């Protein structure tokens, strides 16, 4: 029920939403039933956690995560596996692109600050 709540009931705390997001993705991988894939996913998640959290520093990305996770869950509940997989891929690609933009912006700010 975390992801399928009205907008007014969404948690604005990026750190908490980041933890829920991580659990959501781990649950999806675990549901596939491949223990080795789940183990590898957990290992990768541990390694990239600090970078992934950048995605939850902006309210727009928190809202988008709620919307995207809700759509993925609805597709799964309706047994539309291909649609769920497509939505999940799009969600991950969007998140990666946003984190990349945030990272580049932070690097730019650091360079500008260092040049002063």
Describe the predicted segments one by one.
Residues 1-57, 65-78, 83-94:
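Conserved amphipathic alpha-helical segments that form helical-bundle/coiled-coil interaction surfaces
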Residues 82-116:
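C-terminal effector-binding regulatory domain of bacterial HTH transcription factors
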């Amino acid at each position: 029920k975390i992801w399928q709540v009205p907008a007014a009931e969404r948690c604005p705390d990026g750190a908490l939403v980041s933890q829920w997001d991580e659990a959501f993705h781990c649950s999806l991988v675990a549901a596939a039933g491949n223990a080795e894939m789940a183990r590898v996913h957990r290992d990768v998640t541990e390694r990239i956690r600090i970078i992934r959290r950048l995605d939850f520093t902006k309210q727009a990305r928190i809202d988008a995560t709620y919307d995207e996770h809700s759509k993925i869950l609805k597709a799964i509940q309706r047994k539309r596996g291909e649609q769920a997989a497509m939505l999940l891929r799009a969600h991950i690609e969007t998140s990666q692109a946003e984190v990349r933009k945030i990272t580049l912006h932070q690097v730019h700010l650091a360079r500008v600050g260092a040049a002063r």
